[in-house]
Amino acid sequence: MKKLLILLLFAPNFLLATPLTLSEYIAKNPSWNSSDRPSLSYITLRCGVLFEQISELYKNNVEEQETYKIAPTDAINFFRASSDIYKTSCINYECIKVEKKDSREKVKKWALIYKEELMNNINNNGEMIHGDIKSDFSTCKIKVKPILK
């Protein structure tokens, strides 16, 4: 028990910090939609993961079939944009392989984060789109999706 307390006291802040919402990330990276291609790739990847997780949870919900029909298409478009950005940013195949592997790891990470948060929202609030999820969902729909067209 003492070891756990000592570890918690000395744990770096980044281990205890919650992830930034997309809105917060965008505020810290103001050129995300112009010259900052890595940020745009990261943001579109997170939007893709979020919409994929929403789609999975809405899949069997009869009342939410309209959302279910839209979410997978949006997820695919966000993933495609993220992939296209990192592919065009690389100068060789080796770079693309590294970026693809890194992207897969980010997808796994964010899928777990978003799925847990979506389930917590359902259990605690009776709805999926709430709190930080609502913030990210709105950012993806209002700020990110329009620049992909």
Q: What residue ranges belong to the model's regions?
A:
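Boundary at the C-terminal end of the N-terminal hydrophobic targeting segment
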Residues: L15-P19
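Short N-proximal segments of mature Sec-exported proteins
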Residues: N33-Y93
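Short, charged/polar, low-complexity loop and linker segments
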Residues: Y25-P30
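Alpha-helix initiation and N-capping motif
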Residues: M1-K3, F137
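Compact alpha-helical subdomains of small soluble proteins
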Residues: A75-K149
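Sec-dependent N-terminal signal peptides
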Residues: K3-F14
